[in-house]
């Protein structure tokens, strides 16, 4: 029983905070199988929101965006999520500005779509997502094999459609 509990997008934003997921020197490898589609979705959304945050800061939009986020949470009658504790040494907090919201909620649609397209085309890494290993070698499936294979296919189709060429959506584990 080891690892990091990632139950929400905000958990993933906190985990990856301070690491620019779209930097040319960054490549993330996730050795995860059953929940791979959800973790991959979290990862891609974190990468996009980090780039939205960089855009917001580069264009001096911090105050405007903060007001939008506050209004969203005031309307919901909820407390805005925040990072608790001290940031680790060397962590610049990248990725924490948009806790509780996504870039598409605070930026114009055209701006967000451009940032999204650039982010998913730039991000680098691999997710294991080897459902056959889960089924045949470990018997630890959380989804039926048929459904898991369909999700793998859907992810690959999304990668092709969106020209995601620097991220591998499956890595077959040959050692189990």
Give the predicted meaning of each segment.
Residues 1-176:
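Catalytic alpha/beta active-site cores
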């Amino acid at each position: 029983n080891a690892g990091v509990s990632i139950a929400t997008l905000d958990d993933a934003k906190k985990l990856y905070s301070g690491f620019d997921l779209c930097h040319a020197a960054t490549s993330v490898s996730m050795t995860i199988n059953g929940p791979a589609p959800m973790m991959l979705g979290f990862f891609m959304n974190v990468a996009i929101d980090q780039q939205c945050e960089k855009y917001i800061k580069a264009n001096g939009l911090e105050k405007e965006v903060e007001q939008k986020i506050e209004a969203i949470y005031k309307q919901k009658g909820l407390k805005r999520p925040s990072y608790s504790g001290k940031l680790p040494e060397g962590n610049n907090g990248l990725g924490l500005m948009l806790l509780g919201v996504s870039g598409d909620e605070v930026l114009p649609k055209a701006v967000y779509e451009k940032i999204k397209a650039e982010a998913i085309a730039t991000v680098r890494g691999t997710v294991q997502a080897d459902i056959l290993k889960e089924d045949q070698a470990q018997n630890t499936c959380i989804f039926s094999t048929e459904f898991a294979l369909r999700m793998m296919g859907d992810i690959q189709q999304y990668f092709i459609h969106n020209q995601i060429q620097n991220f591998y959506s499956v890595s077959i584990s040959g050692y189990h």
